[in-house]
Regions:
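Acidic/histidine-rich catalytic cores of soluble enzymes
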Residues: 1-119, 127
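Flexible, acidic glycine-rich loops studded with aromatic residues
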Residues: 57, 104-180
């Protein structure tokens, strides 16, 4: 934690600086959302190591997967438009030869798209974790599988949560399957 964060904690709690730092480490941590990490092209192992090396606790991991489009085409844009709902923002990270371009929502990514760049898109749209692909799109499930392998051999946390809040805004064709 930064010196400023430690000082503020000490000021607001009346604790010494060393007590405030210990309290921050004991009570604050990061909820690692695997969909967000994968959309950002982060490797789960590297993200976990970076947090642990910084002394930041990971009290909860959200088990989730997003959409992955390895080389976006005009046809892909037509197929993904039904996922562009008005309820949630679906951040997009596009990987091009220049690096990573970030868009707050699908509409911004549609407007910026250039087929000649052959970008890979990762879209923060939670999809069923048991699917390797959805409607011809790949998913970020491989990142989830990497994390679960690590979790089996060296547990990161005891609190795993499957995050599925976008189930109701999935295109209707993908909401009908029972998972039980």
């Amino acid at each position: 934690f930064s010196g400023e964060a430690i000082s503020l904690m000490a000021k607001y709690t009346g604790a010494s600086l060393s007590e405030a730092e210990a309290d921050l480490h004991q009570h604050l941590g990061v909820c690692l959302d695997l969909c967000h990490a994968a959309v950002e092209f982060e490797d789960p192992d590297q993200a976990i190591c970076a947090l642990q090396n910084a002394g930041i606790a990971i009290p909860k991991v959200q088990i989730s997967a997003g959409l992955r489009m390895p080389k976006v085409t005009q046809a892909d844009l037509s197929r993904i438009r039904p996922f562009d709902d008005a309820v949630y923002l679906h951040q997009v990270v596009a990987k091009t030869v220049r690096g990573l371009d970030r868009y707050l929502d699908l509409g911004e990514a549609f407007a910026a798209y250039k087929e000649s760049e052959e970008p890979e898109w990762r879209v923060h749209f939670h999809v069923p974790i048991f699917l390797a692909d959805l409607d011809g799109f790949a998913t970020t499930r491989p990142a989830l599988e990497t994390f679960l392998a690590r979790q089996r051999s060296a547990p990161v946390t005891q609190h795993l949560e499957v995050e599925t809040y976008t189930w109701d805004v999935l295109p209707a064709a993908h909401r009908g399957d029972d998972v039980v």
